Amino acid sequence: MHFPAVLLLFLALFPTVLTQTVEHAELLIETTARISDTDANYICATLDWWPHEKCNYNQCPWGSSSVLNLDLSHPFLAKAIQAFEHLRLRLGGSLQDQVLYDVGNLKTPCHPFRKQKDGLFGFSNGCLPMDRWDKLNSFFKRTGGLVTFGLNALHGRQKIKKQWRGNWQSSNAHDFINYTISKGYEIDSWEFGNELCGTGVGASVDAELYAKDMIRLKSLIDQLYKDVHPKPLLLAPGGFYDKVWFEKFLDVSGPTTVNALTHHIYNLGPGSDHNLISKILNPKYLDKISYTFRNLTQTIQANGPWASAWIGESGGAYNSGGRNVSNTFVNSFWYVDQLGMAAKYKTKVYCRQTLIGGNYGLLDTNTFIPNPDYYSALLWHRLMGRGVLDVNSNGSPYLRSYAHCTKERAGVTLLLINLSNQTEFSVGVKSTTSISLHASAKAQHKKRSFLHGLKQTVSWVGSKASDAPLSREEYHLTPEDGNLQSRSALLNGRPLQLSKTGDIPSFSPVLEDVSSPVSIAPLSIKFIVFPNFIAPGCREV
């Protein structure tokens, strides 16, 4: 590597050596109305089917993280899930359309996946034994997981070139779902197929055929769950957005079939790309995916307003993620920006690839210790409520901002992301409510003292003005030692580390005077909670 390239990489990874500048910015939060609402369990993580033989770019990062062999007894795993109270877990992935279920009249032996040169994705069919399914459900019940299970949508079809034709054979899925119901296992949602829409990835199915088989699956679920409440949701197609395919699918399946359209996001490209970090820190690059969100929203509004949008799988970089990138602090800039952007575009659920496995796991594949993105996800889950508010900024594109109603209490939570490696931003925060309140107060109380007028000016952070100082809560995420590729994150300067028994550390905020500007350092992330922010749009969320 030439010296200039080495220097640029060094400066990107260790930004503290640069001379910092301070830039002022103003944010206006629209608090009178919400622009969208997420599901109460917006944060979701996936468990995949890949065996340890899954390799990319001369590395094999999956270990024993599969649905079939993950160590469910590991205390770190249980505590990581329980910290979310009810973490949504999506079981699926590339190999799900090769999974058979060892129940009923299955006529083939129940063998695990094995390498097969002419197999889909280089693997043979695999099988889920019911004793493993029993153990998984015991684990989900113990940890409070909300389960989305991806069904095999290729069973019974025939491959003709890349496209798969013929009707879906539903008998194995029928027996599996029936077994699941008989055991009292609660499934939040069933998903049909993985990355079979449009041109597909390893395989594809025509939209009309797919929709007709979805109608059959819906009928099957209605029949099997006729005496069970609540009835699980039905999701599809679990693939990359294709306008024509999605429109046809919605038109043929009709308004009573699918509850949510699931789509996948891997907008950073292959995990082998040496430019992953520069993509993550480039606001123009991050903005590109907004067109997909916008177009899907329009497709649903025009063709299937009964359905909601879910991101069923998103890992940033595909093919197992980027080594020493996807599992480090720098990836959190991409991840939290995705969470904010997706919510703005009416996404109800966001499933991160993966909870564990590959380079992009929220947990380390071998040690089960949380990577930085885990803590970003948990902070989001605990602070950002369902209601999404619009934010207008006059600042640099390197300052990203998102606002939600604060979770389970009054107020508003603001997320700031500083992508600049040199600029500290000093941010003034106002709201549409504060402006109207101030104007009204000025008109009605012209003769009041300056001090009382000042209290009225800042009354947007509380329902009543008082002599007591008003504070906001700040949760500031930075990388350990200023190294963007650190596997450790700091919260307000303190390392986020598990206890010896795997307990998740507490999140203690720094309290700041609410009337002072919000400061955010270069290459850092900050959640700011305004506890008593007057936000009419947050009522009844």
Task: Kindly label every feature range from the protein language model.
Residues 2-260, 290-312, 316-541:
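Non-catalytic accessory regions flanking glycosidase/transglycosidase catalytic cores in CAZymes
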Residues 200-205, 264-292:
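Substrate-binding/catalytic cleft of secreted carbohydrate-active enzymes
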